[in-house]
Every structure is written in C-alpha cells, then in structure tokens.
C-alpha cells in the first residue's frame, strides 16, 4: 500500500502538467484508497484545495470530477461522454440500478474499470451518433434505408465495382480530349515504313504522333498565327491543335529556360520535337439557300474508307499520298521518304527563304535562320535514308510483286471448281451436274450485283434509325408501301455495303433521311439512285460523333469519335424525283418546314429578349409605340368632291361624298364640334374646287392661299355627314404575337388587352350615339312609339348628353 501512493501521486502530477489543473480525487485516492467513495469525496476535500489554488481556486467538485478519467484504468478518456462522467458524482440520482458490489469505487480494480467503460459504451449506443456532433444537421438517412448517389455517378459496375468511367457515366458526359479531337477531324500524312493495321481496323485508334509527317486541316477560313496575327509561314501545329509560324513558335520557346513551354492559347505543354508541319485548306461553308452537289458513296462493312460509287475500288490498306483521286476520302495517307522530302520539306524551305529575304534586317531573322537549320537537318536525314534505300527499292518491289502474284495464281487455279456442283438434294438419288467448267467472269458479275443489292434493306434500317436526327416519320412506312420492281433489287437479310450521299468536295455533309426515303421510293434503292444530285439547301444540322450516334447510324461508323459532321436537307425537285413521290412525302416535308419556322421564331424572340435585357442594363428602354391605324381614335379627313355647278348642302353632299366624321364628332353634344370650321357655300361656288386631303394624300391641311380665298365667310350650318360606316374600322387586327411576330402555325395568340378594351369602349359609344330606329308596326297603327330606355354600359367622367 505505501508503494501505490507515490505512483498515484506521480500520475496526478503528470495530469497537472498536461491539463493545467489538479484533481482533488487524486489526492483522496492516494491517501484513502480503501475508503468508500462517499467518505473520500467528503473528507479530504480540504487537502486538495491548496493544490488547485494556482489555476482553479474555487475547487469545484463537479470540475474535479470531470478530470477524473486521468487514471490508468480509464484508457478511453477521449471517447467518453459527459453523460457517463457525470454519473460518478454523489449528487447524481439516476445511476444504473445494479452496479455490482465494488463497482461504486472509481478505480478499485481493473475489472471494475473495464465494467465502467462497458456501461458508458452501452449508453452511447442507445443514442444516434448525430446527437453528439454538436449543433449540426442530423442525417437520418440510415433510418429510411435510403442512399443518395450524385448525378452522373450512378451506373452499372463491372465485377468488383471497378468498371471503366465511361460505362458508369450514364449521362454520357466524357472529358474532352484535345488530341482525340485533333485526330478525329484532321488528315495525316504518315511514313509508309510503319504498321497501321490497328488504325485501319478501328477508327478511334490514335495515330502515333512520331510517325506523322504532315497534318492537313480542312476549315472554312484560313487560320492565323496567334502570336503575329498573320497567316502562318511554314506553319507548325502542336499536339493540342494550335497553329503557329515556325519562327514565332521558336521565338516563344526560346524565352523559357526549360526544354518545353506552355501553349500561349491553352497552356498545354509544347515541346520542340512535337511540332509537325501543317497545311490548312479552305473549303466552302454552305448555308441555307445555297446549291450543293452530293455524290453517291459506297463503303464495305469493316472498312473505314468510303469512296464514290463511280470511283470505287477494294481498299485493304491506307491510300497513298500520290493518289489524288481517292486521297480526300482517307484519314491516313502513306508517304515515302521521297514524297515527304519533295512535298513537305522543300515547300517549307522555300517559304522560309522567302520570309528571310523580306525580314532579313529584323530581330526575327535569327529565328528564321534557326528554322532553316532545322529544315536542313531534316532534309539531310531524309536524303540519306532515301539514298541508302534506292539500291534496295527495285529488289523489294520485285519481291512484293512475286508475293502478290503467287496467291492470285493459286486462286485462279481453284476458282472454277467452286460453282460446279450443287448440294445433294434430300429427294434425289443422283448428283446433277449443273454446269461445266465455265470462266469465272460471267459468274462474278451477278454476285457483285447481288451483294450491292443486298445492301438496300439494311440501308433502309439505317435510314429508319437516322430519322431520329432528322425528326422525320418512322421508316416502317416503306415496308407497307408498294415495292417498285427494279432489276437486280432483291430483299435479303444481310448487306456487305453501305450507300449514302456525301458532299462532292469531301466535307462531312450527308443527306437527310427524308430525302433518302424519297430517292429510295423513286429509284427502288440507293444503289440505283443517281451518282450525283444537286439541289438547294433547306436545313443544315451539325452533330458530333458519339457512341449513341454510331449505334443509330451504322453507315457512319467509319467516322471516329468527336468527329464533326452535318446532316443536310435538300429541296429535291421533279428532275430528281417525281411529283408523285413529293406528294407522298409532303406531310413529312411540311412538318419539318413548320418546325423550322417555329424554331426560327423562338430564336428571334430569344434574341429580342436578350437585346432588351442588355439595353436595360445600359439604361436604354424601348420607345412607346402608339398605333395610328385606328381611325376611331385618330379620325382622318376625307376629301371634298366639289363641282362648279353644285353648292355645299345637304342634297349635294349625299351624292358626292362629304366630310366623314367620327361618331364622336357627329353627336350633338360632342366635344369635337369646336375643332372643325364649316366652309361657306357661296365661297365654294365662286372659288375653285379644293380638296382637304386624307392620310393617303400629300397635303392634309388647307394652304394659305385657300384660306385667303375663303375669307371670313362662314356657313350657318354644318354639312350633313355621309352616313357611311366603315365596317373595317372596328375589325380586329390580324393575329399577332405579344412580341410582334405573326404566327402562321396552329397556335392562336392571346389578343392584346389594350386593343380589345379600347375597341369595346368605342363600340359602346357608337351604340349610344346612334339614334334608335322607329318600329314600322308602331308607325302603321298611328300609336306613339315608346321611348326606349337606355342601358348604362360604362361610366366615365365624360358627360354625354342627348
């Protein structure tokens, strides 16, 4: 027992150093370790006060009880709650009913200390962990058995849940890859001494950047160097797709101490060795209303090169750079060392020498000379390789020809035996010899025709799927229509070829499914359609190739991902298709026309709203528009038709047309009486005829000379107004949208409140001013007609008298 006292005191002193306060229970435990906790807490309380005067002068028992878990048996001090610690106080009445015999002692034995920890843990388990997290919101999702996954993260996982990101992302938002976009929309001249089997089989396989000799870009405008803002000279392109002058990019890279620098446009890393030669060709940008020529294309299944049907050939390898007839339809162009030297390197050398001659005395000349040095090194490398291979070229060519001719000879030897015998029939006992050994030529021609004709059903299926882009009708109607008998047209299940129309200049512009269905109806199949068609562009819709689009448009599966293409709708005319075909698809064509008109109206309204919002930010508001077309609110003067032998009077004005006044001015109590001054009949007889013009005439008022001729003579009475009522004055205006756009579609716009309300008031005033007509039955009987009682329709501050 004397040995436990120093150890306990040492523990208490350590606690004083760490926590900055002493515990009275520690001193009581060291002096009276065998006494009950009640006497220990009451007796030696005074002994603990001098020890805690430094930092806690009040000596609160509650405070000291909070520091109790400093003993060795209480190892879970950081995990215990205030509730479990407060139960150790003598004033706490809500203690557990059964604590055990010696369990009331705080630190009597190791078993009791472990039991106290278990009780504290059991009490914490009864409550939610959210109640001990402070003033934060409580999450009760675990009670509802509900888990919320953020948008874009839900999806199907493979195996152990580590599937690819693209398959888990059901929303289809994929990260943008600059190199993928560049390789999908450009053409590459590559060295021919490499293997491109993977690129020829999969359109999404990226080309090795080290094998690229030149990049060809087809754009609607000539690019400019972002450094000098001029058309690039000896242009170079980076892996991120930005084009610079060779001297400008060398100047930019020389400013950095490192071997690479950030792209001035997109801040990607730019290395000197990654710069490739680039040629940008400008193509025509078609808009609505232009005339475009499309040609019929043919592509075999599994082949990534689509060629015109008139120029079609079996393509089993990338097209060479020298093939000008088919080079614009291939993504990869194979080039030999000699072709790279003459068609790439020498052209850059000529451009740099011309630039050096123009800017020889400028600070930029040193970078032009550096570019010329790079061209010289590349030229020597290509010349050395070309000279070393010149001797072997003839031998290699001869060997390749021998290798290619050997399989052809074997195939020609065994080919006549393929179509000699038919299969044995189940009901025949003998094998019939169908034909003798015929040459393969006549047999191959129907086979080719059959393969080409087979493509029609699947092409129709593709057009059905393509209609989702074109917003046309379902293509199932083609199967219900009457089939047109065409030679060589057969309905088979599979197809080895795809047929489609593409722009003649090689741009990725394809014919709309509505036009394709018209051609299929007219000619029976796309195979038998014209090789070229020319028509006016009606609509152009741009798209980007994705997995979803590729599944729905199988004839475009040769385009790589992120490749941009357009679907073009043409206005086909009777020279290409007949009037009967156009009438058959008139509903689809009219539906698409209404959709275009609706889209154009919505676009104009959107632009108008944006313009109004922008003007409001700048403090400019639209002007007030007062319609002057309403002749009731703004009356006009009709011209007098005066003659020399007739005077102004009630009888003459009825025949020749008099002053047409508004209903408000014809009323006896109207306030417009003082606005008009009547003319004298005598003055009108002696003076030449004059006219008071209306809105359509040049002079709506009296001239000064006419006023002098009239003088001061005035008529005693007013001329009787012609009882001519303009029925169109109160006619409702044409249906106009709230934005001022006329809507020719089925939608009926809401009428303007201002116009309808003012017209209703005018109609009410006219009913009040019009005298009641006498009843013919009452006039015959001689009885006095009873005066009709007027009905009040609208009350204003204006007083109308009868």
UniProtKB/Swiss-Prot annotation:
EC supergroup of this enzyme: transferase
Region called Disordered, residue ranges: 1-134, 645-664, 716-753, 767-802
Name this polypeptide is given: E3 ubiquitin-protein ligase RNF10
Disulfide bonds: none
Taxonomic superkingdom: Eukaryota
Quaternary context: Interacts with MEOX2.
PROSITE patterns: ZF_RING_1 (PS00518), ZF_RING_2 (PS50089)
GO BP: negative regulation of Schwann cell proliferation; positive regulation of DNA-templated transcription; positive regulation of myelination; positive regulation of transcription by RNA polymerase II; postsynapse to nucleus signaling pathway; protein autoubiquitination; protein monoubiquitination; ribosome-associated ubiquitin-dependent protein catabolic process
EC number: 2.3.2.27
Bias kind Basic and acidic residues: ranges: 114-124, 716-728
Keyword Translocase: no
InterPro entries, sorted: MAG2/RNF10, Znf_C3HC4_RING-type, Znf_RING, Znf_RING/FYVE/PHD, Znf_RING_CS
Bias (Polar residues) ranges: 645-654, 793-802
